[in-house]
From Swiss-Prot:
Region (RCL): 358-377
Biological process according to GO: acute-phase response
Transcription regulation found in the keyword field: no
Name of this chain's protein: Alpha-1-antiproteinase F
Family to which this protein belongs: Belongs to the serpin family.
Keyword Cell membrane: no
Principal place of residence: secreted
Assigned keywords, A-Z: Acute phase, Glycoprotein, Protease inhibitor, Secreted, Serine protease inhibitor, Signal
Organism expressing this protein natively: Cavia porcellus (Guinea pig)
Length: 403
């Protein structure tokens, strides 16, 4: 069973657990435009759902991780179950042949998983299958070929053993960052689908640890927390955008990954969230003009853990989690539904990016007053792979002291 290794993330993981059920659904056809565009729209829709659930919490998730897991499931889905997944992933079924979607994911995963000396970015897909279950030949071949998925026979009649096996796979793939993801597997589980993404990058322009000091971060009108604030002065890709009433700062990692930070003007977070579009994000990511700036950015570790059944239900993906699921393309031994869908992503932002950077870069700076960019209040960020325009992670920092 061939598999190139998983997606290296600042650690994002998606786990879908399938259980047995009775019943089925009806018939469907094809999906949308190129993968990155659909992923950007999917990320946007999912972000909106998460902010509606709570506009005071940190948010962090990996759109590419969740979409990859769902696209794999769609290979074995039929009827409305199939249509809902592809529409929910923002594929316009009149604009792209379904085969092109899966080929697109295959190319994307291949590009993301290319070995880089500058950063680590790895994705992985694991199928944990009850020993009593036989996968359909076509599904088994397709997930291996298109999604580089590995299949593992699993004894689900011993849930504790099965949990241990799945968690060990995830822990290894995320280099120990995500542990004990799966707890309390239900007794009717027969299939678990796990996708992880792991990213570790180094800033192209690292911050100097000596300049990091404790400073206030204004969570809201009534709450201030103390955080280690990193500082660096230099030439940055940064500008103010009046459409979203926010400062935009691009910080590059070595290699071709960039973080796009969005700092709303005073009281304008809601305006930013309402006006930001995938098209604007693509436009920002291509900006190259630089300005002399004084950047203050909090050191932080942020994570998000989401129940996908709940979140994706808001995007119209409901059948696959219910008695209406038709996953007969995966196996005909028994009717399946996803009994549990989990996504966990985590990220650390520090002076080095993540790994120590020994070199110090000297740059020529103008004799002018630098623009202050103080990330000392809630902000948004996106981590984007430049070679493919793919949104790897999306985050919102409301309180950097909350893990």
């Amino acid at each position: 069973s061939a598999i190139p290794r998983g997606l290296l993330l600042l650690a994002g993981l998606c786990c879908l657990v399938f259980g047995i059920m009775a019943e089925d659904a009806q018939v469907a056809q094809g999906p949308s435009q190129q993968i990155p565009r659909s992923l950007a729209h999917f990320a946007h829709s999912m972000y909106r759902v998460l902010t509606q659930q709570s506009n005071t919490s940190n948010i962090f998730f990996s759109p590419v991780s969740i979409a990859t897991a769902l696209a794999m499931v769609s290979l074995g889905a039929k009827g409305d179950t199939h249509t809902q997944i592809l529409w929910g992933l923002e594929f316009n079924l009149t604009e792209i042949a379904e085969a092109d979607i899966h080929d697109g994911f295959q190319n994307l995963l291949h590009t993301l998983n290319r070995p880089h000396s500058e950063h680590e970015l790895t994705t992985g897909n694991g199928l944990f299958l009850d020993q009593k279950l036989k996968l359909k030949e076509k599904f088994s071949e397709d997930v291996k070929t298109l999604y580089h998925a590995e299949a593992f026979p699993t004894n689900f009649s011993n849930p504790k053993e099965a949990e241990k096996q799945i968690n060990a796979y995830v822990e290894k793939g995320t280099q120990g960052k995500i542990v004990d993801l799966v707890k309390d597997l239900s007794a009717d589980t027969v299939l678990a689908l796990v996708n992880y993404i792991f990213f570790r990058g180094k800033w192209e322009k690292p911050f100097d640890v000596k300049h990091t000091t404790q400073e206030d971060f204004l969570v809201d009108m009534n709450t201030t927390v103390n955080v280690p604030m990193m500082k660096r002065q230099g030439m940055y890709k940064a500008f103010h955008c009046s459409t979203i009433q926010s400062w935009v700062l691009l910080l590059d990692y070595e290699g071709n990954v960039t973080t796009l930070f969005l700092l709303p003007d005073k009281g304008k977070m809601q305006h930013l969230e309402e006006t930001l579009t995938p098209e604007l994000i693509f436009k920002f990511a291509r900006k190259t003009e630089r300005m002399f700036a004084n950047v203050h950015l909090p050191k932080l570790s942020i994570s998000g853990t989401y129940d996908l059944k709940e979140v994706l239900g808001h995007l119209g993906i409901t059948n696959v989690f219910s008695g209406a699921a038709d996953l007969s393309g995966i196996t005909e031994d028994m009717p399946l539904k996803i009994s549990k869908g989990l996504h966990k992503a985590l990220l650390t932002i520090d002076e080095k990016g993540t790994e120590a950077a020994g070199a110090t870069e000297l740059e020529i700076t103008p004799h002018s007053v630098p623009q202050d960019l103080f990330f000392n209040k809630p902000f948004l960020f996106l981590i984007i792979d430049h070679s493919t325009d793919t949104p790897l992670f999306v985050g919102k920092v409301m309180d950097p002291t909350k893990k």
